Structure formats: structure tokens, C-alpha cells
């Protein structure tokens, strides 16, 4: 599976890949991106599912890792929903970058 991730550089700039259809991020990548701990991220994911914003079959995928374990991967719509659900400086930076790239594409 080819996938892209949203990254932050050492200066706090967010890099969003142009191929948004292949953006899938795992829990640790989201924890680092938003600057939260794993239980906070899991609670936000549960809250998004509880509000019935997304069906888990649409926003989540489980892939098998080379070591035999499985990892949950979250699609771009879930990443966007989490960015607006979580209240941290990392999430605010992601929100601003997403809105900026959205407005830039319309022009």
C-alpha cells in the first residue's frame, strides 16, 4: 500500500502531500502531528465515531505490518476531523495549513 503522511518540520511548518487520496496515518504519526498523548487521540477518534460523522469502514483501515502485527490507519477526512476536534497548538497549526491549502486551491 502506497501512502503519504502529513508532516511537520523543525520550524513548525506543515507539509501536506499533493496526492490527498493516499494520505493514511497511523496512531503514532497522529500523536506526533497533533502533540497529544495516545489516550487523548483515541478518545477523540471515539468521539468522532460516536457523533456518526464517519463510518469506521470509510475512515479507518487495518494493515498488516512486516512483523505480523496490525496497525490502524486513518484517512485524510479523519485527520481533518481530529484537527478540528483536538485543542492543541499542533492541531491549530494543522487546521491553519489545511484551510490555507483549501483556499489556495480555489483561486
Give the ranges of each region predicted by the language model.
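Short Lys/Arg-enriched helix C-cap and helix-to-coil transition segments
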Residues: 53-67
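DNA major-groove recognition helix of helix-turn-helix
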Residues: 45, 49
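Residues at alpha-helix termini
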Residues: 34, 51-52
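Key DNA-contact positions within bacterial/archaeal DNA-binding proteins
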Residues: 39-43
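Positively charged, aromatic-accented nucleic-acid-binding surfaces
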Residues: 1-36, 63-107
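Short, charged/polar low-complexity linear motifs in solvent-exposed/disordered segments
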Residues: 50-51, 99
Amino acid at each position: 500500500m502506497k501512502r503519504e503522511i502529513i508532516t511537520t518540520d523543525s520550524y513548525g511548518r506543515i507539509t501536506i502531500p499533493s496526492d490527498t487520496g493516499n494520505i493514511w496515518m497511523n496512531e503514532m504519526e497522529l500523536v506526533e502531528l497533533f502533540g497529544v498523548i495516545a489516550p487523548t487521540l483515541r478518545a477523540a477518534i471515539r468521539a468522532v465515531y460516536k457523533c456518526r460523522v464517519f463510518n469506521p469502514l470509510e475512515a479507518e483501515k487495518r494493515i498488516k505490518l512486516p512483523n505480523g502485527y496490525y496497525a490502524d490507519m486513518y484517512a485524510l477526512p479523519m485527520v481533518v476531523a481530529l484537527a478540528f476536534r483536538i485543542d492543541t497548538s499542533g492541531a491549530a497549526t494543522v487546521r491553519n495549513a489545511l484551510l490555507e491549502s483549501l483556499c489556495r486551491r480555489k483561486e
